[in-house]
Amino acid sequence: MTMKETIDLLGKILTNILIALYEPFGFSLLLSFLAMFFYLYAYEPTAAGKGWKSAIVTWYQKFKESVFFRKLFFLAFVTSLIMFRTLLNRQLWMNPLSDVMGGWGIWETVNGERQLTTECIENVIMMVPFSAVVMWTFGEKIGNGWKKILWQSGKAAFIFSIGIEMLQLLLRLGTFQLSDIFYNTVGGVLGGLMYCAVMKARKRL
């Protein structure tokens, strides 16, 4: 790969990441805010049925006082960003099983021409923050062993990816691709590795 092709690849990846963050930001923030109301309804039922003002005050107090609540809110936000990217911002496909294997490299052939694609790299990058935030949120339950963290982060990304692909298949939003599941899982393991590195660095400080 030449220097120009490398720069084009990095530029395309950066552009797609910024678009993926910018487009659904407000929607994801609102969805996460509403999702945490369901959490409060399930785990703080004493505050239910007292009007919307009381509900908002309870939400704010819980967000201010509970570290776990803030972690869950951030996890809901990251999850909704991914859901928007993979499901809500997609066109309908007549045949979701038209490309089951998917793309496994950064080059693809379209109408006999070789074209650069960043899909596999973006699938890896997409799951890194997700699995890292999952480990951060449930780290106390999972434990500190790096092997266990990598296993759990990879498993979380794999299950989440399978869920997304099945929804794409059932709703005809995009195509079901095995390569997506593989690269998402790799991204999940990398997210777990990043979490391990950050926790290790924090202990040294």
Could you tell me what each predicted segment is?
Residues T2-L173, L178, G192-L205:
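Bulky hydrophobic segments
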